[in-house]
């Protein structure tokens, strides 16, 4: 999908375009939730079946799954959250960027919540590919038991290939993701319809009383079961995160016309199968199909899980770029893999981290049964964070009264906290994995944000105001620097101060260019910046100008390209007579930095690992001059 496609007003969308986007959203938005039937019902049956399985328990479990889909996915995400957008974009960091502008006194709390939500999503991006691919490949055991020993090697090979092709981009095959996943949903729905006839009594699961009665009577077992039932709605966060790719209406249409009916029918079919044949609880999904259809279904399931994994990986790339632009992570290499769509990106460092994390999980847990216990915490945590931030959103942006916000969102929050509590019971069985991953990412992002703020404050105390510097340097004297032809552009984060690179250039080279541009790059709290708002130019003196370039947090920051548009303002920009001056700082830890020593060390390590700004901002390598300095943090 191109960026242009994403932002058509929903109200003016033709039926043809709506259908096209709806099918596309099935592969990207619903890929993850579409793989849940592979393991969700099976995992929910296990704790209940320990002392024998009754008819009422099977119906109650399916009822819990149906109403989880109805309340959390349909009501919260499809009908409510898809309207809480930031200029068409959704997701935790997009919501955070919007709220930070209007936060009143609790910025730090909001920021920490947003970072936690982003970190939980990155943890989910490791677990989802491992679990979904394993669960699909395990279907081979039913085709022929001799393949049991090859499940892990085959899964590792598929995942290795998936991560290997990321650098080449997936645009060429992405057009097939939606149709393939749509076929997957249709096949699941048809299988469900066929097996509902096994026992029409399963239709009683649509009555919420079965779900409520089960939780009221089963006590602690009911809480344990909720942890498995929650697997039904994993992937719901993708609805919100991918809002900007397809728009609200196509995502809603896809849910109500195809995805929700197919999931409901499949879970009802699995339930009816187990009612008729209790031994089918060992793998109710694959046992719905006749033996001759098993291999094609396993192949289709594997394709569906690969597509779901691809969607999560792409989401991780997009989220990381947002985090970099919003100042939560250091610069990383961002490669655009499409000549026509700047939204198709590849981050080598993120790809490597995800790859090693996913392979480690597959080799450590070995089965989808074991890995399913680790799943859920990251997703429930992210959902709770989103709901809390949505509470702030409706108060600030929609002007809801406090009682109204409490009345609408408190029931959802309470339900999600119950699910979170149920998943936390699995900490010792592998649930610690997403907790550790999320903690690590949160600490990294918080450290970078805090360290950057401290560094900015320290350098500001020693900086020379730009106006004072220009006044003194342009006074005629015997010590005036020599003037050289051309333009010098000095990148700085503080446009009010003379850049360190400018001062070092004068100190060591004793020259000043005919034209000097103090350039600041700003990331706004909007996903994209209109071309007319891209830049502002302020003339400081005959030789000095102050320029600010603005980018949205979803945009690639191609500075050379943006500067070319400045010719309209009369600021001549000839790449062959322009030099870019960058300051490179060597950071030295200080006992009085305001952060613990280990955090100082972490911040310095992150700064040293950051991508060179000349590469990140797409500056011509042969026109860049770097001047270094030591800074104590």
Curated annotation (Swiss-Prot):
The family database entries (Pfam families) matched by this protein are listed as: K_trans, K_trans_C
Quote the cellular component terms of the Gene Ontology held in the record: plasma membrane
GO MF annotation terms? potassium ion transmembrane transporter activity; symporter activity
Query: Keywords assigned by UniProt?
Result: Cell inner membrane, Cell membrane, Ion transport, Membrane, Potassium, Potassium transport, Symport, Transmembrane, Transmembrane helix, Transport
Stretches that traverse the bilayer: 21-41, 61-81, 107-127, 145-165, 176-196, 219-239, 255-275, 293-313, 345-365, 371-391, 402-422, 427-447
Q: Which reaction does it catalyse?
A: K(+)(in) + H(+)(in) = K(+)(out) + H(+)(out)
* Entry annotated with the keyword Transcription: no
- Topology class, membrane: Multi-pass membrane protein
* Compartments, record wording: Cell inner membrane
InterPro entries from the UniProt entry: K+_transporter, K_trans_C, K_trans_N, Kup
Q: What does this protein do?
A: Transport of potassium into the cell. Likely operates as a K(+):H(+) symporter.
* Family, per entry: Belongs to the HAK/KUP transporter (TC 2.A.72) family.
Name of this protein: Probable potassium transport system protein Kup
Which organism was this protein described from?
Rhizobium rhizogenes (strain K84 / ATCC BAA-868) (Agrobacterium radiobacter)
What gene does the UniProt entry assign to this protein?
kup
């Amino acid at each position: 999908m191109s960026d242009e496609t994403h932002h058509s007003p929903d109200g003016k969308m033709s039926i043809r375009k709506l259908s096209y986007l709806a099918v596309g959203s099935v592969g990207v938005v619903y890929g993850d939730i579409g793989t849940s039937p592979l393991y969700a019902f099976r995992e929910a049956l296990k704790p209940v079946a320990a002392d024998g399985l009754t008819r009422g328990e099977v119906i109650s479990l399916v009822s819990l799954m149906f109403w989880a889909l109805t309340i959390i996915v349909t009501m919260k995400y499809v009908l409510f959250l898809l309207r809480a957008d930031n200029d068409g974009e959704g997701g935790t960091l997009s919501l955070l960027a919007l709220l930070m502008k209007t936060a009143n006194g609790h910025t730090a709390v909001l920021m920490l919540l947003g970072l936690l939500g982003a970190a939980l999503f990155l943890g989910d991006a490791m677990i989802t590919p491992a679990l979904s691919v394993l669960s699909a490949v395990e279907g081979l055991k039913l085709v022929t038991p001799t393949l049991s020993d090859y499940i892990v090697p085959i899964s590792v090979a598929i995942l290795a290939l998936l991560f290997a092709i990321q650098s080449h981009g997936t645009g060429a095959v992405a057009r097939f993701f939606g149709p393939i996943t749509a076929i997957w949903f249709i096949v699941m729905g048809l299988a469900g319809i066929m097996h509902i006839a096994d026992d029409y009594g399963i239709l009683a699961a649509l009555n919420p009383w079965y779900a409520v009665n089960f939780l009221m009577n089963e006590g602690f077992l009911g809480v344990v079961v909720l942890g498995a039932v929650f697997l039904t709605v994993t992937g719901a966060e993708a609805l919100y995160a991918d809002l900007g790719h397809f728009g609200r209406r196509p995502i809603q249409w896809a849910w109500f016309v195809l995805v929700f009916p197919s999931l409901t029918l499949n879970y009802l079919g699995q339930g009816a199968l187990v009612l008729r044949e209790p031994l089918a609880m060992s793998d109710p999904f694959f046992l719905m199909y006749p033996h001759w259809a098993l291999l094609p279904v396993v192949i289709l399931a594997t394709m569906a899980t690969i597509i779901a994994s691809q969607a999560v990986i792409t989401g991780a790339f997009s989220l990381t770029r947002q985090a970099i632009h919003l100042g939560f992570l250091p610069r990383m290499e961002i490669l655009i893999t499409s000549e026509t769509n700047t939204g198709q990106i590849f981050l080598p460092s993120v790809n490597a981290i995800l790859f090693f994390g996913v392979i480690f999980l597959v080799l450590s847990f070995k089965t989808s049964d074991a890995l399913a216990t680790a799943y859920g915490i990251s997703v429930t945590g992210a959902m709770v964070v989103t709901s809390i931030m949505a509470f702030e959103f409706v108060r600030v942006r929609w002007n809801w009264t406090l009682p109204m916000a409490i009345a609408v969102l408190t029931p959802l929050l309470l339900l999600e906290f119950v699910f979170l509590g149920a998943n936390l019971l699995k900490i010792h069985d592998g649930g610690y994995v997403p907790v550790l991953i999320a903690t690590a990412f949160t600490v990294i992002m918080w450290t970078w944000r805090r360290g950057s703020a401290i560094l900015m404050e320290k350098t500001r105390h020693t900086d020379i105001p730009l106006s004072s510097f220009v006044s003194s340097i342009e006074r005629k004297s015997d010590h005036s620097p020599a003037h050289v032809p051309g333009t010098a552009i000095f990148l700085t984060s503080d446009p009010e101060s003379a850049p360190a690179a400018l001062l070092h250039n004068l100190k060591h080279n004793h020259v000043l260019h005919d034209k000097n541009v103090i350039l600041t790059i700003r990331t706004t709290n909007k996903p994209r910046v209109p071309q007319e708002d891209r830049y502002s130019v302020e003339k400081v003196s005959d030789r000095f100008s102050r320029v600010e370039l603005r980018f949205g947090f979803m945009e690639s920051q191609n500075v050379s390209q943006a500067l070319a548009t400045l010719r309209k303002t009369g600021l001549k920009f000839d790449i062959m007579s322009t030099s870019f001056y960058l300051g490179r700082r060597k950071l030295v830890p200080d006992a009085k930095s305001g952060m613990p020593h280990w955090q100082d060390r972490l911040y310095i390590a992150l700064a040293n690992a950051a991508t060179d700004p000349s590469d990140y901002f797409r500056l011509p390598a042969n026109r860049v001059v770097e001047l270094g300095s030591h800074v104590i943090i």
